[in-house]
């Protein structure tokens, strides 16, 4: 090996990290120092000298040898790092970390000598599945509840209700109370942050506000003032208030009630643009059943994906989780911006940290699941063919041609390819896994679905159907 060649040695570390031990030749160090001096000389302004004509020694005296070496060292490390990655054909997941620290390297740096540098970085983990075929999962057996149709109708009636004033009776559940209130902690007497309002419309329904608040307003009359001694739940959203006792002074300023429309053909026309109540009920039933079936499919797929993830063997580097967390925060910021909110003022360091902490568990699960699917694709040689991508792209031709914005075709192709691959992987899981349904009341598991390539047409098995990997948010 030539004396002026970079020497690279790599050592695998736990958690999918790699250590790079670099020996950088003195020729590289000299070249970078001279390039740094020439670069600074072209822009430095020193009285008595023209730009680019400043003697080397004058420049060193003016700027300082340490500062020059620091600038050169940054260039040396970056240049050698990029070269080392090419030599070893390694794609890093994270920025390299200097093991000895920059200041330590700078202290011993000399352009006349070779330089030894140790850097560490994260790389993609090696993936392995303990098992891919014959996964078995158990889900709760659930039936469509016809009562949900009536509940949906009632909800619709409430949406189209007339609001009328109440003057001759006390408040009751179902009313809309206009209240003012002021809350303080019982032990300290300190006012509760967000616990004060001059006027708020409050629907008197159970589980609104903290326990006892709504119940305390029931039976009050307009003009009444009442003291409520309450307690915040232990799992309350604001940590400072959890489990604390509180005192609220509440005044009932006004009272209203909902006048619900009759369930008839006129209501069907008003609420759902249907000709009759029978037609409206039929439409609601179809929507609810479709949603129910989709939810059941989603639950089944979630269980299969969880089972697959449990079979994954991989040392996942921290940087992969960090990237997922950062992407989640950026997506949240984009949603805020689309709503017209000032992202810069809203996303304080405290909020960003809070979001990072709260989303990390889900981010970790997402990364594990994606890696498990990737491992499945590699293990079972499941791929997306070019004709499948071309066919999918045709669905977007009109949108692309009509869009006023420049569409990144390469990025779109990548997204569509990933979506198609995920669909194929989920179908494969359904066809090669066993799903058991357990009856909640008896707690007995009943086999309802087992399909493999060999038994796909067996009459005693039920093939699970394709679905997308989504959870219904509560």
Swiss-Prot record:
Protein name per Swiss-Prot or TrEMBL: Trigger factor
Pull one GO CC term from this UniProt entry. cytoplasm
Low complexity composition bias: residue spans = 442-467
Q: Which residues cross the membrane?
A: none
- Taking every annotated instance into account, which residue ranges of this chain make up the domain PPIase FKBP-type? 174-261
- Cite the domain annotation text: Consists of 3 domains; the N-terminus binds the ribosome, the middle domain has PPIase activity, while the C-terminus has intrinsic chaperone activity on its own.
Give the reaction(s) catalysed: [protein]-peptidylproline (omega=180) = [protein]-peptidylproline (omega=0)
Q: Which GO terms describe its molecular function?
A: peptidyl-prolyl cis-trans isomerase activity; protein folding chaperone; ribosome binding
């Amino acid at each position: 090996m030539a004396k002026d060649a970079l020497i690279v040695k790599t050592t695998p570390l736990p958690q999918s990290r790699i250590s790079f031990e670099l020996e950088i030749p003195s020729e590289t160090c000299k070249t970078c120092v001279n390039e740094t001096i020439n670069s600074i000389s072209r822009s430095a302004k020193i009285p008595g000298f023209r730009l680019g004509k400043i003697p080397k020694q004058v420049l060193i005296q003016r700027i300082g040898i340490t500062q020059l070496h620091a600038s050169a060292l940054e260039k040396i490390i970056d240049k050698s790092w990029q070269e080392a990655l090419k030599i070893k054909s390694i794609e890093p997941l994270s920025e390299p970390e200097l093991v000895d620290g920059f200041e330590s390297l700078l202290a011993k740096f000399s352009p006349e000598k070779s330089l030894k540098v140790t850097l560490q970085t994260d790389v993609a983990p090696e993936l392995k599945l303990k098992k891919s075929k014959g996964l078995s999962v158990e889900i709760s057996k659930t039936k469509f509840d016809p009562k949900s149709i009536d509940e949906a109708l009632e909800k619709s009636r409430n949406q189209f209700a007339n609001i009328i004033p109440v003057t001759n009776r006390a408040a009751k559940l179902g009313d809309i109370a206009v209240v003012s209130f002021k809350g303080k902690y019982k032990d300290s007497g300190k006012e509760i942050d967000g616990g004060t309002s001059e006027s708020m419309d409050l629907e008197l329904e159970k589980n609104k506000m903290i326990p006892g608040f709504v119940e305390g307003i029931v039976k009050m009359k307009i003009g009444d003032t009442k003291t409520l001694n309450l307690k915040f739940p232990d799992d309350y959203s604001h940590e400072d208030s959890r489990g604390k006792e509180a005192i609220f002074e509440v005044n009932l300023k006004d009272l209203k009630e909902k006048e619900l429309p009759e369930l008839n053909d006129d209501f069907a026309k008003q609420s759902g643009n249907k000709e009759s109540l029978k037609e409206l009920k039929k439409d609601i039933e179809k929507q609810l059943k479709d949603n129910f079936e989709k939810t059941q499919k989603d639950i089944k797929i979630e269980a299969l994906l969880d089972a697959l993830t449990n079979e994954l063997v991989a040392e996942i580097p921290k940087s992969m989780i960090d990237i997922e967390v950062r992407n989640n925060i950026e997506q949240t910021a984009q949603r805020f911006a689309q709503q017209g909110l000032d992202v810069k003022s809203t996303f304080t360091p405290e909020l960003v940290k809070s979001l990072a902490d709260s989303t990390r568990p889900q981010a970790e699960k997402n990364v594990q699941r994606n890696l498990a699917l990737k491992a499945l694709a590699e293990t079972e040689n499941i791929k997306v063919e070019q004709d499948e991508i071309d066919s999918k792209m045709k669905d977007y031709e009109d949108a692309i041609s009509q869009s006023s914005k420049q569409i990144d075709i390469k990025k779109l192709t990548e997204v569509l390819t990933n979506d198609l691959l995920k669909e194929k992987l989920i179908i494969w899981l359904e066809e090669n896994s066993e799903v058991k349904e357990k009856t909640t009341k008896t707690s007995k598991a009943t086999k309802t679905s087992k399909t493999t390539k060999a038994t796909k047409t067996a009459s005693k098995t039920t093939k699970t159907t394709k679905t997308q990997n989504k959870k219904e948010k509560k």
